[in-house]
Amino acid sequence: EVTEGALTDRDTEILCLAFGNPTRNTGRFRECFRKYRDRWHHIHVDSRTAAITNKAQLKQWVTDYGEDSDFVKVRVRGIFPDASDTQLISAELVRQAKERSLTERDVAGAPKIMGIDVARGGADQSAVWLRQGLFVRRLYKRHTLDSMVFAERLASLLREHEPDAAFIDMGAMGAPVYDRLCHLGFGHVIMGINFSQGAIRDDLYLNRRSEMWHAVAKWLRDGGALPSQGPEAQDIEDDLCAPEYFYNTKGKLQLESKEDMKERGLPSPDDGDALALTFAAPVVRRADIPARESMHGGLEDYDPFTW
């Protein structure tokens, strides 16, 4: 980004050359071959075609690790790995999910769950995703300046799609949106989630955000289908492949924070967080819960969070 800022001369022929080894599947160099590929002329070198390399050693590596292993891709073939050692969701996993074809009709028996990520401001955008079983789609993404206007838009989406449950990011900007939705009568279906709050399985995950993102990875392995067309297809791919993870001193999985991602030059994963929020807690489909009589007579309100 610093380099691009200096290449703004109008009447100067500008040549920008980026050399590197494809050792990581994230970062600005990776995006020269993916998101920004149309802006660059690519030259790729396979080690086996270089005159000075030890062909016998390279052949042995291919035999030991396999032609399609990440080790051979990086050290021999000169192409990007499917996943870095610390990448939670690999590009290959996302690619497979984008090739699956599902419709809402295929998952009609599953609960409908809405995930709402509220932007903190700046370049971040608010995003809304709807998941039903293995099917998912984006409903909304936009820069949000007024919390009340965004709350009214969410109320419209809740009325239109009638999810069994909706989970909203309760960060700095999310709390007033949540309060407004409750005031509008959606308190029975919406639940606020703090990314830093304790995980349901706090023996395995540092916080709820780490737990939700790991659930997304499992959902993809289990057959989840991602959009393959439209701007949301590239947005969700970029987001899901971006965060890295590690295990803390207590052996709990911890997802890379948004602040650390920004230090690596990566934007906030707004779409990824919205999708992850659809895994915030188990949800029971409205039609699967029989009406129950309360202690004071009449029927109890539907509670989707019966877990």
Where are these regions (language model features)?
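Short, flexible loop motifs at catalytic/binding sites
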Residues: 1-85, 104-307
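N-terminal accessory regions of nucleic-acid-interacting proteins
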Residues: 91-97
